[in-house]
Amino acid sequence: MLYKGDTLYLDWLEDGIAELVFDAPGSVNKLDTATVASLGQALEVLEKQHDLKGLLLRSNKAAFIVGADITEFLSLFLVPEEQLSQWLHFANSVFNRLEDLPVPTLAAVNGYALGGGCECVLATDYRLATPDLRIGLPETKLGIMPGFGGSVRMPRMLGADSALEIIAAGKDIGAEQALKIGLVDGVVKQEKLIDGAIAVLRQAITGDLDWRAKRQPKLEPLKLSKIEAAMSFTIAKGMVAQTAGKHYPAPMTAVKTIEAAARFGREEALNLENKSFVPLAHTNEARALVGIFLNDQYVKGKAKKLTKDIETPKQAAVLGAGIMGGGIAYQSAWKGVPVIMKDINDKSLNLGMTEAAKLLNKQLERGKIDGLKLAGVISTIHPTLDYAGFDRVDVVVEAVVENPKVKKAVLAETEQKVRPETVLASNTSTIPIRELASALERPENFCGMHFFNPVHRMPLVEIIRGEKSSDETIAKVVAWASKMGKTPIVVNDCPGFFVNRVLFPYFAGFSQLLRDGADFRKVDKVMEKQFGWPMGPAYLLDVVGIDTAHHAQAVMAAGFPQRMQKEYRDAIDALFDASRFGQKNGLGFWRYKEDSKGKPKKEEDAAVDDLLASVSQPKRDFSDDEIIARMMIPMINEVVRCLEEGIIASPAEADMALVYGLGFPPFHGGAFRWLDTQGSAKYLDMAQQYQHLGPLYEVPEGLRNKARHNEPYYPPVEPARPVGSLKTA
């Protein structure tokens, strides 16, 4: 053994070839600060081996290196800029030493090589991969850019266009694509990976392969003519501006850095990468996006822990076909759980099957599946008008009309047709589970399972624990949602649960703005362009359905009369009374017509202004800041109340439910991350300016306490130790 660290070791393999093996104590290898330091120490040993002829890098895990240790990021990002820059210089000196070894080097890559893992293998001369490879640089999705030389080496290896596509989008690609663009030199089966790697190294050692020529382009300026450079970077910047926008600075920074570094050799180019990375790491956007990644891991880990002793349902059923029922049935079947879809008439069943078939055909058109797979999936969806087969069902979700009487009748009838241990769930969006459970003989086997529309796209499923729901019931439904590829978040029961409970105060803020003379078009523009929502409130209401919102508004008002009971007729009432239900009937705040692809396209409709004038004061202008404050304060206050009341268990789960269920702008990180970023005291000062608008604007006492003591909602993060103690020598 030449060297043994905590996460890697170095040993002789054969005939002058050494192997450096990543072998962390846990289930995966991460390129954390300790591993970078250990790699430097291993290279120091290697550099003294006079009989060294070649080096093989490999992993003892199912994946090569999954990336940097993102749990370190928040503390690293708090380190002063100069110290973070010094540490990056040290880390890059390690990878440069790997690249500068006087012998050929090869990385044998199995499974994932992402982020720092990808940057590590870019420093070797050759790369062999297994067919299950996923390789790429996802840093821009975390609000940063490659910092271990990825923005320097990848363009010089692949050419500007291919590298820009991967880096700016934060993409990872598979083995076939990686081989095609030259990111790997060969693809071999797992069992032949090491033999293949040694064979390539031997060819390089004997001179049959010119490893020096392979290495040289990575050390030099990017080979691009002025015209090629202008085209590549202009197109890349245009695409990034269109897709990322101003709220996500990392992709544009990465493109501009690669452009600026193109005329330099490795050392100067790495300095430019460093100068761009460090300021990005200190942005609120980076902290928010890293926070989302960590929260996602926390939520998924919690679901995994909850279901560790539970068998995933093998047969499911959906009550109520149509678009929602068909979407749920498709998702279950697509992910491998056969499903019975029951309705009371053929028309609805046909609609549900048509929806499932449409979604499968889209997969076929995109080349994701073939005809055989399509037929196999659709054959596991069984439409029926009766309860045949329900005695074999493990879990049933009811997705009928949002009417408590109808839901209770359907659930009570179904309970008599299934086994005693079968779990029943309701896809209600607002009706308390306690109320629906009152119709059942086995309320302990019942809970809520709130999908979001469209089911195949929206990652969140709210799992609602009723007062009598058993732990096993919740675990079974969480297991099914996870199997469907969804992110289940368990919440406690109340009208609207979590997501809709916090959404309707936001809509109430919108209604009050319109009542006071705001133009809905400006409100939408500000909330989309300035705050960053994917849709403004008027457009969102049109998509949800004005009739749906009108009904849900009444349910929420009955549930929380002190805050959500209106004392005036609002825009939603006016549109509802005029039968303007939104996209579903072509008229809402906007008029809708189908575009060439059959999708609804919104157009101005002057008639709506006359309609809204009857429920609004004369038009007046509001500043962007005032619009954002009046829209967001009711939502933030309600989110905080939900945490204080135990409706949602943690800030992390609340923020992920908002991002995955409502499209809360990821660069803000969620409501609690947004609160922590600006500080509770600053938020309180802002909110108090609007408390005259009513109870929805009154800040909860718990938040006032946070403001008084300057306490964040997320646990405080300490800056990483000074760079000198990060094992940098």
UniProtKB/Swiss-Prot annotation:
Substrate binds at residues 296, 500, 660. NAD(+) binds at residues 324, 343, 400-402, 407, 429, 453. GO terms for cellular component: fatty acid beta-oxidation multienzyme complex. The record marks 119, 139 as: Important for catalytic activity. PANTHER family: TRIFUNCTIONAL ENZYME SUBUNIT ALPHA, TRIFUNCTIONAL ENZYME SUBUNIT ALPHA, MITOCHONDRIAL. Involved in the aerobic and anaerobic degradation of long-chain fatty acids via beta-oxidation cycle. Catalyzes the formation of 3-oxoacyl-CoA from enoyl-CoA via L-3-hydroxyacyl-CoA. It can also use D-3-hydroxyacyl-CoA and cis-3-enoyl-CoA as substrate. This is Fatty acid oxidation complex subunit alpha. It comes from Salmonella schwarzengrund (strain CVM19633). The lineage of its organism: Bacteria, Pseudomonadati, Pseudomonadota, Gammaproteobacteria, Enterobacterales.
